[in-house]
Amino acid sequence: EKLISYGKSLGLDAYYINNVFQTILEDSVLNQQAMLQKNLNPEAMSETHRVAYLGGQGSYSQLACHKYFSRRPGKVIEMGCTSFDQITGKVESGQADFGLLPIENTSSGSINEVFDLLQHAQVSIVGEVTHSVEHCLLAMPGTELSHINKVFAHPQPFAQCSRFIQGLGDIQHETCDSTYHALKSAVETPNSAAIGSAQAGKNVGLEVVKSGLANQSENHSRFIVVARKPLQVSKEIPTKTSLIMATKQQAGSLAD
C-alpha cells in the first residue's frame, strides 16, 4: 500500500506498481529455490547443459528454455528437435541432459501427445516453467492480410487461435511439426503466413501482420523439464508429484 501510495504521487498507475512488485517477489523466490537445488544436487550443476526442445530459433520452447535455465550456472547447449519423441529419445540415450516438453496451455488445454509419451519414456520430471504465449500472424515484408491465401502453424497454435482462423474464411491451413518449420514454410511460400512469436518471425525475416490472435487474452503454456534421473528436492521448496494411472473402462473405476 505504501508503494502504491508513493507511486500515485509520482503519477504511476497502481496496477503497474503492483505488477512490478509481484515480479520482483517472484524472481526472488525463484532465485532462492535455484540456490537450494544447486546445493542439494551439485552433480547436476555441470558447466554445460545440453537441452533438447521442439523447434529452432525463436520457438516458444526455446524461449521457455532460456527462461528456465537462466537461473542455473553453466552454458546451455541447445538441441532443436522435430518431434516430442526425438526430445525424450535424446534424453534417454544420453545425447541431452534435459528435455523441455509443453504439457498444457490455458487456451487449448492438455497436450495429450506428451502425456501419452510420458507413459513409455524412461525419464523423470525435474522441473517446470510457465511461459507467456503471444501469437502473431507473420509474413514476408509488405504482405497484406488480404493477400494471404495459406497459413502454416503447429497444431497447438491453430487450436489456440481457432476463432481468428475461422474468421479468415477459405484460406488454406497447413500443420507443421514445429513453429520453426511453419516460419520457414512461410518464407519459402508466396502469399502465405505463419503463426508464431514476433521474435521468431524477426529471426527469419518475417514481419507481424496481426497480433493478439489467441482465443484468450491471457495465453500461457506450461512446460516440464525431464532428465534421465530424478533430482532431490529441498523440503523448503513446494513441489508437485505427477502420477500416471490406468483404470478399467467402466463407470466408477476412477473412484475405486
Residue map of PLM features:
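Domain-level signature for soluble enzymes in the chorismate/prephenate branch of the shikimate pathway
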Residues: 1-256
